[in-house]
Amino acid sequence: NIQSIARYSKKFSNEDLHEIIISKNLEIEAWFRKQWIKYPAPFYSSIDLRNSGYKIAPVDTNLFPAGFNNLDVSMESLYISAVQHTLEKQSAELTKILIVTENHTRNKFYSKSLTTLKSFIEKAGFEVQSCMLGDECNTEAINKDLVLNNSILSYKKFIPDIVLLNNDLSAGVPDILKNTKQLILPDLHMGWTNRSKTCLLYTSPSPRDDPL
């Protein structure tokens, strides 16, 4: 069992809490595994945590994450194993993965993240390609190298078994993805076209409505 030592930029005001979390690591992991059986986790996500010194709380979740290049390299074997396990659960026949990226791949930080993500997938034993959803010269148009033929999506003659979205679809879901037979992860309905922070704010129950 490989365990990592958490390092926080802000010191805990209660060191006992930190020690309890570390000592209960196996029980915490077991609880998460049980929850993931009941509520399957997305292929990937990132969570922003806020450390106030006496508690740590999640403040934001991203279903189309970047920042893979910031992960601890000493834990790479765990990332690769997670990729293998998650994809093999979909089908043992999977071999080819297409990552549909954001249109700002010239952003050096995003490019580093994408390179790292591709590396994890390749080391997990899969063939992987990536492409922007938008055309390089006109991002409002669909990438001309993405072709849909008989509901099968291909990119430069590369036919993926799974399409991995790393694009939040804030500009909408294009027909080329709506009509694709291949499995798309995360689901198209998870894009920002169907979600809104404003809607979440106004549809969430008031704290006063929650039972004590």
Where would I find each of the regions flagged by the language model?
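A short, gly/pro- and small-residue-rich
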Residues: 170-194
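Short secondary-structure boundary/capping segments
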Residues: 113-116, 179-181, 200
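Redox-cofactor binding/interface segments in oxidoreductases and associated redox assembly factors
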Residues: 164-165
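Glycine-rich, charge-decorated loop segments at or immediately adjacent to ligand/cofactor-binding or catalytic sites
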Residues: 195-201
